[in-house]
Amino acid sequence: MSQTIDELLIPHRNAIDTIDAEILRLLNERAQHAHAIGELKGTGAVYRPEREVAVLRRIQDLNKGPLPDESVARLFREVMSECLAVERPLTIAYLGPQGTFTQQAAIKHFGHAAHTMACPTIDDCFKQVETRQADYLVAPVENSTEGSVGRTLDLLAVTALQACGEVVLRIHHNLLRKNNGSTEGIAKVFSHAQALAQCNDWLGRRLPNAERIAVSSNAEAARLVAESDDGTVAAIAGRTAAEIYGLDMVAECIEDEPNNTTRFLVMGHHETGASGSDKTSLAVSAPNRAGAVASLLQPLTESGISMTKFESRPSKSVLWEYLFFIDIEGHRRDAQIQTALERLGERASFVKAIGSYPTAVL
């Protein structure tokens, strides 16, 4: 007599139960070792970005499937987040309110066990870490379609904090509405200025007559719509904001560029050690004379150092002087980069190492 489906499932379910029990035992054993490490460190830094990245890269190298590498890395990010919380939960400042893409980036980098602190402005994010009310901050630095976030660059040039990580987040915008799943009757659309720009073509086609109103963040737009009694308003925000504020998804993925991506920097008080695959962010200023910029870059190009970003921004202190924000491959403690930075310092009127940090794994 042939076995039923339920009977055929029994050995697999029994095996899964056994495996789950072993996973649980090993997770708690790992947490015990994490706690012991925390005791040995004492008041030292409990978060080591280069160590976490090394673990994730090693796990991906060991992975034989069928789980994809990214899924395995996400799982172990959460494991490390929970184990780190056993040592001491981290507090992460981000541009609020709750539900912003910056909060998503913070959770992607630090895991759900970290405490996230919503701040009203990017300036306040920096202040919370500088005054040690938070351990780290996550701030948007550039978007693939709209370019750099100017206020973040301004703060990077003057803060004493160090860049210690980066987060790359795919951005999907959705049109949200309160108790209404239709585009009919929408007269106003609230969102962050960059989100409105990133959805410009879609809005022009589908809501050509709707007024576009810029607010401090996408999540703030969702909050405003959720609290409004005006049935003609809508917001552009992420799925997380829709869930938090109880809004209907009228249209999904309305961004004009399907590969829309935002890069964030993680800032803290400590320098980060080399991980083997790093970036270094710099802020430099050239003397105001002909050929100064070409001369400025010469130490990097002659050393064969690869630049992944080069952008100018007006200086806030000297009229008609510009700051150049440069990202290079490698760590500031690498001998080749140390030499290049020394030569750069001889040519520049201002040089600041914003920080060296591991390239994003997730």
From Swiss-Prot:
One Pfam family cited in the UniProt record for this chain: CM_2
Domain Chorismate mutase as annotated: residue spans: 3-91
E.C. number(s) listed in UniProt: 5.4.99.5, 4.2.1.51
UniProt: substrate binding residues: 13, 30, 41, 52
Site positions for Essential for prephenate dehydratase activity: 262
Catalytic reaction equation(s): chorismate = prephenate; prephenate + H(+) = 3-phenylpyruvate + CO2 + H2O
UniProt GO BP: chorismate metabolic process; L-phenylalanine biosynthetic process
Domain of life the protein comes from: Bacteria
Pathway involvement of the protein, from the record: Amino-acid biosynthesis; L-phenylalanine biosynthesis; phenylpyruvate from prephenate: step 1/1; Metabolic intermediate biosynthesis; prephenate biosynthesis; prephenate from chorismate: step 1/1
GO CC annotations, alphabetized: cytoplasm
Keyword Isomerase: yes
UniProt-annotated location(s): Cytoplasm
Gene Ontology molecular function, alphabetical: chorismate mutase activity; prephenate dehydratase activity
Keywords assigned by UniProt, alphabetized: Amino-acid biosynthesis, Aromatic amino acid biosynthesis, Cytoplasm, Isomerase, Lyase, Multifunctional enzyme, Phenylalanine biosynthesis
Prephenate dehydratase domain location: 92-269
Record SMART domains: CM_2
Residues covered by the ACT domain: 281-356
Summary of the function given for this chain in its UniProt record: Catalyzes the Claisen rearrangement of chorismate to prephenate and the decarboxylation/dehydration of prephenate to phenylpyruvate.
Protein name, per record: Bifunctional chorismate mutase/prephenate dehydratase
Organism annotation: Neisseria gonorrhoeae (strain ATCC 700825 / FA 1090)
Name of the gene: pheA
